[in-house]
Amino acid sequence: GRTSTWEIRYQNESDVGLRLISTAKGYENVEWLLDYSLPNENEAVATLTVCNYGDAPVRTSPGFHPYFPAVGTQFDFNGAPYDADYIAHTEFVASPSDTHVAFDGLKLDIRTQNLPVYALWSDRNGQYTCAEPTAEGNAFLSPARGGQFVSGHGKKRYGMKIRLIA
């Protein structure tokens, strides 16, 4: 989806909805609906709905890619300390649907749906660190498991809600 051209379904001051009809082999019958919303000044919501109109199941492993400003390298992820200088190659961490992250005094709650693995990384090319909720991390490098599929004529929703605490 990153290199694809998405169609705008709707747009207003605080919401945008995008649509992609796949042309990739094996995904010809798949529609991707991506919705972003800013419900208030402290929240951002992203939802991806994968609609499989074909007969065969399709493999998916999506993720959202939020970058957070972080001048320093130290951050906290669910109470565990991390140093961004040591995660340049990505660390995959399982997390419950409610996650707590803190960077340089910025405190966030991230609530997810069907995204139980976080990719934690920073290439230190800028003053940011990434805490990216994913369906199964780098799962496409391994044989498929059942949770990675959207059944024929089925839908699956993935969601992320970021709430600023301080």
Regions found by a protein language model. Name each.
Residues 38, 50, 162-164:
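Hydrophobic beta-strand positions in extracellular immunoglobulin-like domains
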Residues 33-35, 89-91, 145-151:
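Beta-strand-rich interaction surfaces with strong enrichment in secreted/lumenal proteins
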Residues 17-23, 97-166:
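Beta-strand-rich recognition/accessory modules
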Residues 34-36, 44-52:
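Short, well-ordered beta-strand segments enriched in hydrophobic/aromatic residues
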Residues 40-41, 152:
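Surface-exposed loops/turns
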Residues 25, 41, 53-55, 67, ...:
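Short coil/turn motifs at secondary-structure junctions
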Residues 1-40:
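Extended, loop-rich substrate-binding clefts of extracytoplasmic carbohydrate-active enzymes
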Residues 55-118:
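Active-site/ligand-binding surface loops and adjacent short beta/alpha elements
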